[in-house]
């Protein structure tokens, strides 16, 4: 295993500008938290190297700076079919929140695989990689008349997660056709209401959050306020642990969601407390160690970004 250089990975931003509110923690406390985060990344890497699939191991090494983003993206692109779709890349098998449930619910493998590819590229910050063009063409070719993706025949809500995630992730790119987003937006706007995201409804909350964060829509401002409040409420009442809360923020590509006031330092402390002694996260989830790999990768990426925000 090549050594991952963690120096600098978890260095936070510059000191607050004059006139801004002082940080809640002292410099010594922030420094100690960064050191703890670096140790957590080392332990998480060991866990993923032991239990993760080959592509997942490459992804985590890339996030830690041991491999280039171009190398990882090329490996992902190599799986792409001629029609622009992707086969299953292992995120659902690794226990990725939402994706694992979509797999069980019967989302077509080529649709789920394409969603996995978009998530993996998004985590790397590669929203404009050339292979996304083909993925967008494929997804538009199979988009249902009502603007959704997912198993046909069920209630509209059964297609919410796939539709919100796919349209939201594509909304960050430069290649998606407006009519694809408009059709998905008409569907999502027609079913959105606060009850859809309250309580333990992480998939719905996250799918709506990703879509309304990245796609212009008449409901976006008000919906994001509800989403932010429900995310914070779910986190503070422990309906969602820190890992799930962070994964929503990662999908939305933002540590600041309207309506939510989540302190990066406190969220990082809670996240690190969820790491098990074997270095992995989601210790009490169903399944074996292999299904804890993606939650561990999520927590590691969250650790990096939260540490930079200190």
Where are these regions (language model features)?
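Preference for long, amphipathic alpha-helical scaffolds in soluble/luminal domains
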Residues: 1-310
């Amino acid at each position: 295993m090549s050594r991952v250089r963690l120096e600098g990975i978890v260095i936070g931003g510059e000191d607050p500008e004059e006139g801004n509110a002082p940080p809640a923690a002292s410099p010594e406390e922030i420094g100690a938290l960064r050191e703890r985060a670096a140790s957590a990344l080392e332990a998480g890497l060991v866990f993923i190297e032991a239990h993760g699939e080959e592509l997942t191991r490459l992804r985590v090494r890339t996030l830690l700076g041991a491999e280039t983003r171009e190398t990882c993206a090329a490996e992902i692109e190599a799986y792409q079919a001629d029609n622009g779709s992707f086969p299953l890349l292992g995120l659902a098998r690794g226990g990725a929140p939402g994706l694992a449930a979509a797999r069980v619910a019967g989302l077509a493998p080529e649709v789920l695989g394409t969603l996995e590819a978009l998530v993996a590229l998004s985590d790397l910050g590669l929203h404009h990689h050339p292979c996304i063009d083909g993925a967008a063409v494929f997804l538009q070719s199979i988009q249902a008349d009502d603007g959704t993706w997912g198993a046909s025949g069920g209630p509209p809500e059964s297609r919410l997660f796939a539709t919100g995630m796919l349209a939201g992730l594509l909304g960050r790119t430069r290649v998606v056709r407006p009519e694809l987003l408009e059709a998905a937006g008409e569907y999502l706007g027609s079913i959105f209401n606060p009850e859809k995201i309250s309580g333990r409804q992480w998939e719905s909350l996250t799918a709506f959050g990703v879509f309304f964060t990245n796609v212009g829509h008449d409901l976006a401002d008000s919906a994001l306020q509800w989403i932010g409040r429900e995310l914070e409420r779910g986190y503070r009442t422990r309906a969602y642990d820190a890992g799930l809360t962070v994964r929503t923020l990662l999908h939305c590509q933002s540590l600041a969601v309207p309506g939510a006031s989540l302190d990066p330092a406190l969220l990082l402390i809670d996240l690190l407390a969820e790491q098990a002694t074997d270095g992995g996260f989601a210790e009490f989830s169903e399944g074996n160690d292999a299904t804890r790999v993606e939650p561990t990768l999520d927590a590691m990426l969250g650790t990096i970004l939260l540490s930079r925000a200190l």
